Amino acid sequence: MPQMMPINWIFFLFFFICIFLIFNIMNYFIYEKKMHLINKFNQKKKLTFNWKW
């Protein structure tokens, strides 16, 4: 049914954005915890920016 196509695309876009945000939030918390444990071992007073890329 061609009339339903815009609704399907909107649902797909909304679903994709939700999954993307959930994975990013999970990745942030997992990576943040790991970096906190690593930074606890080498306590330095300088600012260290540790990025994933």
From Swiss-Prot:
Q: Which family does it belong to?
A: Belongs to the ATPase protein 8 family.
Annotated keywords:
ATP synthesis, CF(0), Hydrogen ion transport, Ion transport, Membrane, Mitochondrion, Transmembrane, Transmembrane helix, Transport
This one is known as: ATP synthase protein 8
Show the GO MF annotations: proton transmembrane transporter activity
GO BP term (any one): proton motive force-driven ATP synthesis
Write down the superkingdom of origin: Eukaryota
**Principal cellular location given in the protein's record:** mitochondrion
Q: Where in the cell is it found?
A: Mitochondrion membrane
Instruction: Report quaternary structure and partners.
Output: F-type ATPases have 2 components, CF(1) - the catalytic core - and CF(0) - the membrane proton channel.
Give the protein's function.
Mitochondrial membrane ATP synthase (F(1)F(0) ATP synthase or Complex V) produces ATP from ADP in the presence of a proton gradient across the membrane which is generated by electron transport complexes of the respiratory chain. F-type ATPases consist of two structural domains, F(1) - containing the extramembraneous catalytic core and F(0) - containing the membrane proton channel, linked together by a central stalk and a peripheral stalk. During catalysis, ATP synthesis in the catalytic domain of F(1) is coupled via a rotary mechanism of the central stalk subunits to proton translocation.
Membrane disposition: Single-pass membrane protein
Q: Which GO terms describe its cellular component?
A: mitochondrial membrane; proton-transporting ATP synthase complex
- According to the record, the segments passing through the membrane are 9-29
Q: Which InterPro entries match?
A: ATP8_metazoa
